[in-house]
Amino acid sequence: LLGFAPAKLIHDQTEVARSHAPRFALIAGGRPDQARALEADGVTSYLHVPSPRLLTMFLEQGATRFVLEGRECGGHVGPLSSFVLWDTMVSTLLATVKDSAQAGGIHILFAGGVHDALSAAMVATIAAPLAERGIKVGVLAGTAYLFSKEIVDTGAVVRGFQNAALACDTTVTLETGPGHASRAATSPFADAFLARRREL
């Protein structure tokens, strides 16, 4: 879900999501109150957090599940590269979360460029101090999932989308507004989008 979308769109999307009784929700650009509303319906919800200040604010507001998604991700991209973001956020969590009971309730998912054994090992290394503190850690490997058989078989994406991703060897960042950019395959659509943006 896009937490920064217009209120009616968020409401409508949330109602559709609830009708499918998902086990998990990822909320990009969301707020703790949005996560709490889904959690009240039994949907485990994670908030994307692109900066240490937001992480601290969200912890103070009672949020406990976060996605730390660096700029190397597909889809919506944040302002910081993965390693810079992850290092900063791990330091913030270690400085903020001192109580073991609180630590045990916090879940962190690392995302943005995690695609093979080496990148997963890098996450394991940077996340080790959090795990030692009792914070639960994991990874989102969205790009790896994009290339799987299951993503098409389950209807999460259509084969044409996957084929475009498989054929892609370069990407572009399409900015739809201040602070809102998405990574996309270099394509006629991306070329038209960028040309129109230049015209405006």
Regions found by a protein language model. Name each.
Residues L1-Q102:
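Active-site entrance/lid segments in N-terminal catalytic domains of soluble metabolic enzymes
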Residues L85-W86, V90-G104, H115-L200:
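Conserved active-site-proximal phosphate/metal-binding subdomains
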Residues I106-G112:
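A short, small-residue-rich loop immediately preceding and capping a beta-strand
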